[in-house]
UniProtKB/Swiss-Prot annotation:
The UniProt record lists the keyword Metal-binding: yes
Protein family per UniProt: Belongs to the SELO family.
Keyword Manganese: yes
Catalytic reaction(s) noted: L-seryl-[protein] + ATP = 3-O-(5'-adenylyl)-L-seryl-[protein] + diphosphate; L-threonyl-[protein] + ATP = 3-O-(5'-adenylyl)-L-threonyl-[protein] + diphosphate; L-tyrosyl-[protein] + ATP = O-(5'-adenylyl)-L-tyrosyl-[protein] + diphosphate; L-histidyl-[protein] + UTP = N(tele)-(5'-uridylyl)-L-histidyl-[protein] + diphosphate
Cross-referenced SUPFAM superfamilies: Protein kinase-like (PK-like) (SSF56112)
Species for this entry: Methylorubrum extorquens (strain CM4 / NCIMB 13688) (Methylobacterium extorquens)
Organism lineage string: Bacteria, Pseudomonadati, Pseudomonadota, Alphaproteobacteria, Hyphomicrobiales
UniProt: ATP binding residues: 88, 90-91, 110, 122-123, 173, 180, 259
Annotated residues for binding of Mg(2+): 250, 259
Protein name in UniProt: Protein nucleotidyltransferase YdiU
Required co-factors: Mg(2+); Mn(2+)
Length: 497
C-alpha cells in the first residue's frame, strides 16, 4: 500500500540548528470533525484513507506517518515592536512536504504537543481557535486571497487549560512554506551568515527560482517578498480583513495569510478598528496594516544585509531601493482593487480621491463596509442611464445621513460615464469584487460557542457551506450576510491557541 502522505521533504535537509526534531504527542480519543476532501485531492492524497481510523490518528498526532520527518522550526521575531531572539514553533510540528497540483506544500499539525520551543507551554490548541482558523482560512481562499489552508480538524478527547478548561483540538495546516520574516531574523541575530545564506538559498529555490538567475539573487528574493506582501495586504483591505497580530514571526515570505489567532473582519467601516484584546494601542488596526507590513519588511531587509553586498554601504543602498518599491506596489494593488469594487475598468487620476471620499463618508456615517460595496453593485445606472430606485435606497439606508451618500454618488455616476461596456457587465464586475458573504464576527463566535459548549458542529458546517461561495447570492442564507446589531462595536478577539 502506498504511503498516506507521499512526503518529499526539503526543509528537513537543512542544518540541524534550523529546527528541533520532535514527534507529536498522543491524545486520548481523537475524532475527526472535518476533512477538506477537495484540498486532499489537490494535494494528491486519498481522502477516504485520511478519514479512516489510521488517517484520523495521523491527523491527531497519534501516529507518525511513513516518510514524515517531524520537526519544529526555529525563528525569532518582533512582537508588538519588541524583538524576541528565539520563538519557534511552540505548538506546531511540520510533518513534511508533499507535491500536489499547485506545487510543494507543507503539512503541519497545530496543537500536537510540546516542542523544544514551547516555552513552558503545553503545545496544545483549544477547539475554538482551531475552528476559527479552519473557517477563516478557507473563507479567505474562497475570496481569492493567498492563504494557508486547512486540511483537517480533529478533537482530541482531552481538555486544555487556558483561563478555563476547554476541549482540545488539532488543525492540519497546509502552506506553501512556513518560512517567516522571523526565520531570517533568527540567524541574523546570531551573526550566523552561513545559516542565513542557507535559508535564503532554500527560500529562493522554493519561492523565487527565477531569483537564482538574477545579478543579485538575494536582492531579487527581497524584491519578491515585498511584491507579494504589497499585493496581499492590499487584498486584505479590499475585503475588510484585520489580521490582528502582524508580528514579524507571523509574516510569511510566500505572501500567504498565516496565523489567524485574533483575526476579524470589519463590520462598520472605521480604519482605526482593532479587535485584538492584546492590541491595546491599535498597532495592528485595519488602516495601519500597510505601514506595519513595510515595517516588517524593513526588518527582513535588515536581516538580509550581509547577503545583499559585502560592502555595508552598498548593502544598505540595495535594501533601501527594494523597500522604496513597496509604497507604489501597494498603492497600485489597493487602488486597482477599489476601482474594481466601484465598477471602474480603467484608471483616472481622480479615482483614488473618489474612493477615498466614499470611505470617508462611510466612516462618518457608520456604514457597513461589506454591505455598502455589495449593494453599490446593484445601484449602477442601467441602459437608460438611471439606477434602480430600490437599489439606490438599499445603499442609502446604510448611511446615518443618506444625503451624504447622494453627494458622493453623483460624482461616481459621472465617472462611470467615462467607462465603456454595458451596465450588466459592470454589475457583474462589481459582484466579482464585492463579496456578499464574509466570516461575520458574530457568526464565527456563535459557531465556536455551539461547538465548544454543546459539541454542535452544525453551525460550523453551515458557515463553511455559505463562505465557500462568497460572491454568489444565496437567498436561503441571506441572514449570514447581515451585520450584527450595533455594527459590531466592542467586539474583541483573542489569540486563543
Amino acid at each position: 500500500m502506498t504511503a498516506l502522505f507521499p512526503f518529499d521533504n526539503s526543509y528537513a535537509r537543512l542544518p540541524s540548528h534550523f529546527f528541533g526534531r520532535v514527534a507529536p504527542t498522543a491524545v486520548e480519543a481523537p475524532r475527526l470533525i472535518r476533512l477538506n476532501r477537495a484540498l486532499a485531492v489537490d494535494l494528491g492524497l486519498d481522502p477516504d484513507r485520511l478519514e479512516s481510523p489510521e488517517g484520523v490518528e495521523v491527523l491527531a498526532g497519534q501516529r507518525v506517518p511513513e516518510g514524515a520527518e517531524p520537526l519544529a522550526a526555529a525563528y525569532a521575531g518582533h512582537q508588538f515592536g519588541q524583538f524576541v531572539p528565539q520563538l519557534g514553533d511552540g505548538r506546531a510540528i511540520l510533518l513534511g512536504e508533499v507535491v500536489g497540483r499547485d506545487g510543494r506544500r507543507d503539512i503541519q499539525l497545530k496543537g500536537s504537543g510540546p516542542t523544544p520551543f514551547s516555552r513552558r507551554g503545553d503545545g496544545r490548541a483549544a477547539l475554538g481557535p482551531v475552528l476559527r482558523e479552519y473557517l477563516v482560512s478557507e473563507a479567505m481562499h474562497a475570496l481569492g486571497i493567498p492563504t494557508t489552508r486547512a486540511l483537517a480538524a480533529v478533537t482530541t478527547g482531552e481538555q486544555v487549560i487556558r483561563e478555563t478548561a476547554l476541549p482540545g483540538a488539532v488543525l492540519t495546516r497546509v502552506a506553501s512554506s512556513h518560512i517567516r520574516v522571523g526565520s531570517f531574523q533568527f540567524f541574523a541575530a546570531r551573526g550566523d551568515v552561513e545559516g542565513l545564506r542557507a535559508l535564503a538559498d532554500h527560500a529562493i529555490a522554493r519561492h523565487d527560482p527565477e531569483a537564482a538567475r538574477a545579478d543579485n539573487p538575494y536582492r531579487a528574493l527581497l524584491d519578491g517578498v515585498i511584491r507579494r506582501q504589497a499585493a496581499l495586504v492590499a487584498r486584505w483591505l479590499t475585503v475588510g480583513f484585520i489580521h490582528g497580530v502582524m508580528n514579524t514571526d507571523n509574516m510569511s515570505i510566500a505572501g500567504e495569510t498565516i496565523d489567524y489567532g485574533p483575526c476579524a473582519f470589519l463590520d462598520t467601516y472605521d480604519p482605526a478598528t482593532a479587535f485584538s484584546s492584546i492590541d491595546r494601542h491599535g498597532r495592528y488596526a485595519y488602516g495601519n496594516q500597510p505601514r506595519i507590513a513595510l515595517w516588517n519588511l524593513t526588518r527582513l531587509a535588515e536581516a538580509l544585509l550581509p547577503l545583499l553586498s559585502e560592502d555595508e554601504t552598498q548593502a544598505v543602498a540595495e535594501a533601501e531601493a527594494a523597500l522604496t518599491g513597496f509604497a507604489g506596489q501597494f498603492e497600485a494593488a489597493y487602488h486597482g482593487g477599489l476601482n474594481c469594487k466601484l465598477g471602474l475598468a480603467t484608471t483616472r487620476d481622480g479615482d483614488p480621491a473618489l474612493a477615498g471620499d466614499l470611505l470617508k463618508t462611510m466612516a462618518e456615517n457608520e456604514a457597513d463596509f461589506t454591505l455598502t460595496f455589495r449593494r453599490l453593485g446593484e445601484a449602477v445606472p442601467g441602459p437608460d442611464g438611471e439606477p434602480d430606485p430600490a437599489a439606490v435606497e438599499a445603499v442609502r439606508s446604510l448611511f446615518i445621513d443618506p444625503t451624504a451618500y447622494d453627494r458622493w454618488a453623483g460624482g461616481w455616476r459621472r465617472r462611470l460615464k467615462d467607462e465603456a461596456g454595458d451596465a450588466a457587465a459592470r454589475r457583474q464586475m462589481m459582484r466579482a469584487a464585492n463579496p456578499a458573504f464574509i466570516p461575520r464576527n458574530h457568526r464565527v463566535e456563535e459557531m465556536i460557542t455551539a461547538a465548544v459548549e454543546r459539541q454542535d458542529f452544525a453551525p460550523f458546517e453551515t458557515l463553511l457551506t455559505v463562505l465557500a461561495r462568497p460572491y454568489d447570492d444565496q437567498p436561503d442564507f441571506a441572514q449570514y450576510a447581515e451585520p450584527p446589531e450595533g455594527g459590531g462595536r466592542g467586539y474583541r478577539t483573542f489569540c486563543g491557541t
